[in-house]
Amino acid sequence: METPTPRVKPGFNGVGVGMGSSVNGSSRRAGYYMGPAGAVAVAGGGRAAAAAPVDGCSVALRVFVLAATLVSAVVMGVDRQTSTIRITVTDALPPLEVPLTANWSYSSAFVYFVVANAMVCLFSAAALAACRSRAAMVPVMVGDLLALALLYSAVGAAAEFGILGERGNSHVRWPKVCNVYGRFCERAMAAVIVSLIAAFANLVLLMLNILTIHKSSSYY
């Protein structure tokens, strides 16, 4: 009987333990690898499929992005206000009172904002479900990059339209409307701010994912 010869193999963090032995001419190998997700057993001469390392901070950020984008999409999606506008036709006639409605769907920027936040919310839910799959790490990272670009573009478009409604544009004689639709503008502003915070959280999440893939690259 041969004496078992220990073999050390690198794991995710360069730390691993292996044991090989040969009995009656047959070779057997067993061991385990230590990584961020714990010990991964390997036996029978093969390598077990390792689960992706799960970072609690990344999961918390993912849940926050999901919740924040959901809130932003819902708040903007129900934003609507009807106000009575006085219109003077001639000085000889009393002003006419006309009810006018401001709705988020009347602005293409706000429509894009709602759709973008809804898409990022759905992607965050799918990424949470796939967070333990090592094969999904790179696709999720690419998705995070696209989600980040989508959020920032949506926030920029909605913020620009909101500033136009708040201040108007004297160069083209566009009057401000937030003095008439105050509640509508406040809700839109709140949705944009929450979505901007979600975009920052998504940026941090993307950086953490890149760092995780870099640390575990020695496994391959």
Curated annotation (Swiss-Prot):
| Entry annotated with the keyword Transmembrane helix | yes
Give residue ranges on the Cytoplasmic side: 1-57, 130-144, 209-220
Q: Which domain of life is it from?
A: Eukaryota
**Transmembrane segments annotated in the record for this chain:** 58-78, 109-129, 145-165, 188-208
Keyword Membrane applies: yes
Q: Name one Pfam family in it.
A: CASP_dom
- Residue ranges, Extracellular side: 79-108, 166-187
**Similarity remark:** Belongs to the Casparian strip membrane proteins (CASP) family.
Subunit comment: Homodimer and heterodimers.
Q: What is this protein called?
A: CASP-like protein 1E1
The species is Zea mays
